[in-house]
């Protein structure tokens, strides 16, 4: 049965596409409100090189910006761009008052230090939420820009469980700076009891079996099956893995979807779960950047 048919027959499947569309509609209304007050939200996207996947991601981001009414500026550079040249471009965008958000598409060519580049972006324009000031601010519970994927995951959880997540035990599988660590911090902010497991954790399966919420972000295809899950858990699958089946490539998550589905109360599919939320929350973060730069509104 196709995923579309499964979603019609199973309320357990969290429809990330539909929820992301709702987020985009919210953003669209807010953009109109800002424009009525003379502020045109603007996102600058920087792409270095010609990586095909990066080009697709940039195109999708620009299209979604156009849909919600956010002005986008694209800056494309050859793969041999020097780090100093890229930093100079970021400095220009930092000082440009009409630019509210800056996104540097990763990965960058090997001659460029990603950490130095991301740290150069002004924290209030850092729509990816990767700057150390924003990372620290999140851990302190301050109103800062947070990474798009885990922030989108919180919205998916609230759509399934309601706005109050307090007291629930959440297990985050993976400790990356992009998803795992900020996911744990955001869940703590929601007053969940949070456990982070990773490659060095003993008895991962037993730990996961205690969880009301499981967020899988480890990058291993179908690693989590029903034996890891307790009945009625809510599962958010952040993984995107390409595997070969019957001489065809298909996308799967970190969770064995078909095995887990009968066990859980709700689960995100791959594709069509977390992925659409990431770009939707990039648009949401661009508006958050506008608010931070124009606190009087």
Swiss-Prot record:
Pathway: One-carbon metabolism; tetrahydrofolate interconversion. Keywords: Amino-acid biosynthesis, Histidine biosynthesis, Hydrolase, Methionine biosynthesis, Multifunctional enzyme, NADP, One-carbon metabolism, Oxidoreductase, Purine biosynthesis. PROSITE patterns: THF_DHG_CYH_2. GO terms for molecular function: methenyltetrahydrofolate cyclohydrolase activity; methylenetetrahydrofolate dehydrogenase (NADP+) activity. One of its GO terms (cellular component) is cytosol. NADP(+) binds at residues 174-176, 199, 240. Gene3D superfamilies: Leucine Dehydrogenase, chain A, domain 1, NAD(P)-binding Rossmann-like Domain. Its EC number is 1.5.1.5, 3.5.4.9. InterPro entries: Aminoacid_DH-like_N_sf (IPR046346), NAD(P)-bd_dom_sf (IPR036291), THF_DH/CycHdrlase (IPR000672), THF_DH/CycHdrlase_cat_dom (IPR020630), THF_DH/CycHdrlase_CS (IPR020867), THF_DH/CycHdrlase_NAD-bd_dom (IPR020631). It catalyses: (6R)-5,10-methylene-5,6,7,8-tetrahydrofolate + NADP(+) = (6R)-5,10-methenyltetrahydrofolate + NADPH; (6R)-5,10-methenyltetrahydrofolate + H2O = (6R)-10-formyltetrahydrofolate + H(+). The keyword Flavoprotein does not apply. Pfam families: THF_DHG_CYH, THF_DHG_CYH_C. GO terms for biological process: L-histidine biosynthetic process; methionine biosynthetic process; purine nucleotide biosynthetic process; tetrahydrofolate interconversion. SUPFAM superfamilies: Aminoacid dehydrogenase-like, N-terminal domain, NAD(P)-binding Rossmann-fold domains. Transmembrane segments: none annotated. The keyword Glycosyltransferase does not apply. Homodimer. Belongs to the tetrahydrofolate dehydrogenase/cyclohydrolase family. Catalyzes the oxidation of 5,10-methylenetetrahydrofolate to 5,10-methenyltetrahydrofolate and then the hydrolysis of 5,10-methenyltetrahydrofolate to 10-formyltetrahydrofolate. This is Bifunctional protein FolD 1. The lineage of its organism: Bacteria, Pseudomonadati, Pseudomonadota, Gammaproteobacteria, Moraxellales.
């Amino acid at each position: 049965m196709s995923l579309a048919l499964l979603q019609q027959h199973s309320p357990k499947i969290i429809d990330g596409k539909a929820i992301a569309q709702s987020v985009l509609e919210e953003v669209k209304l807010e953009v109109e409100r800002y424009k009525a007050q003379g502020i045109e939200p603007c996102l600058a996207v920087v792409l270095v090189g010609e990586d095909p996947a990066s080009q697709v991601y940039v195109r999708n981001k620009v299209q979604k910006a156009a849909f919600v009414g956010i002005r986008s500026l694209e800056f494309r550079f050859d793969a041999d761009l020097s780090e100093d040249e890229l930093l100079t471009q970021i400095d220009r965008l930092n000082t440009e008052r009409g630019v509210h958000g800056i996104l540097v598409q990763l990965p960058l060519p090997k001659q460029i230090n990603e950490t130095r580049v991301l740290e150069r972006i002004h924290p209030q324009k850092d729509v990816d939420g990767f700057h150390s000031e924003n990372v620290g601010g999140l851990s302190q519970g301050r109103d800062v820009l947070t990474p798009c994927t885990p922030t989108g995951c919180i919205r998916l959880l609230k759509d399934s469980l309601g706005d109050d997540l307090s007291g629930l035990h959440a297990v985050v599988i993976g400790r990356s700076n992009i998803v795992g660590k900020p996911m744990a911090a955001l869940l703590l902010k929601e007053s969940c009891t949070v456990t982070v497991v990773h490659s060095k954790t003993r008895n991962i399966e037993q730990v996961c079996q205690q969880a009301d919420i499981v967020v899988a972000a480890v990058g291993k295809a179908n690693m989590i099956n029903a034996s890891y899950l307790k009945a009625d858990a809510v599962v958010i699958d952040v993984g995107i893995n390409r595997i070969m089946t019957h001489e065809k490539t298909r996308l799967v998550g970190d969770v064995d979807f078909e095995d887990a589905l009968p066990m859980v109360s709700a689960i995100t599919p791959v594709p069509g779960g977390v992925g659409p939320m990431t770009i939707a929350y990039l648009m949401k973060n661009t508006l958050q950047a506008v608010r931070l730069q124009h606190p009087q509104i």
